Amino acid sequence: MKIAIGCDEMGYELKQTLITRLKEKNIEFTDFGSFENEKVLYPSIAEKVALEVKNNDYDRGILICGTGIGMAITANKIHGIRAAQIHDSYSAERARKSNDAHIMTMGALVIGPSLAVSLLDTWLDSDFSGGRSQAKVDLMEEIDQKNR
């Protein structure tokens, strides 16, 4: 698995924590910023990561800002991307199993580092289940195509 990860300055410390976890799990990743003491407008980072995932250069993406909301909204502007804001273990699991979310977003001002690592593990260890959820994901894609 290959992960694209990015954040704004508010998410920098949490991103570093998640990078440590990716290394522990021997998961290949690329850090798309922001970098230490770098101020960025988060939509630019969300766009970079979402495009990398959309173009199949990376299997999944992780985006972190203050709340996770703006990153999710921006990533979902990219045709074909499903980004989910994750702040609890059930949502982390269902984002993958039910919705086949390509990108998880988190809020560094909303959750702490130990919860973030747990959510990352849950999200990484969950796969799309298909079944009844397949029709829902297919309809999401149809709506996305129709409204581009």
From Swiss-Prot:
Q: Which SUPFAM superfamilies match?
A: Ribose/Galactose isomerase RpiB/AlsB (SSF89623)
Q: What is its EC number?
A: 5.3.1.6
**Secretion signal span:** none
This protein's record includes keyword Isomerase: yes
Q: Which Pfam families match?
A: LacAB_rpiB
Q: Which GO terms describe its biological process?
A: carbohydrate metabolic process; pentose-phosphate shunt
Keywords, A to Z? Answer: Carbohydrate metabolism, Isomerase
| Annotated binding of D-ribulose 5-phosphate, by residue | D8, E9, G66, T67, G68, I69, G70, N99, R132, K136
User: What is an example of a GO molecular function annotated in this UniProt entry?
Assistant: ribose-5-phosphate isomerase activity
Q: Per the similarity annotation, which family is this?
A: Belongs to the LacAB/RpiB family.
Query: Which PANTHER family does this one have?
Result: RIBOSE 5-PHOSPHATE ISOMERASE, RIBOSE 5-PHOSPHATE ISOMERASE-RELATED
Under NCBIfam families, the record lists: PRK05571.1 (NF004051), rpiB (TIGR01120), rpiB_lacA_lacB (TIGR00689)
Q: What does this protein do?
A: Catalyzes the interconversion of ribulose-5-P and ribose-5-P.
For this entry, the protein name equals Ribose-5-P isomerase B
This protein's species is Listeria innocua serovar 6a (strain ATCC BAA-680 / CLIP 11262)
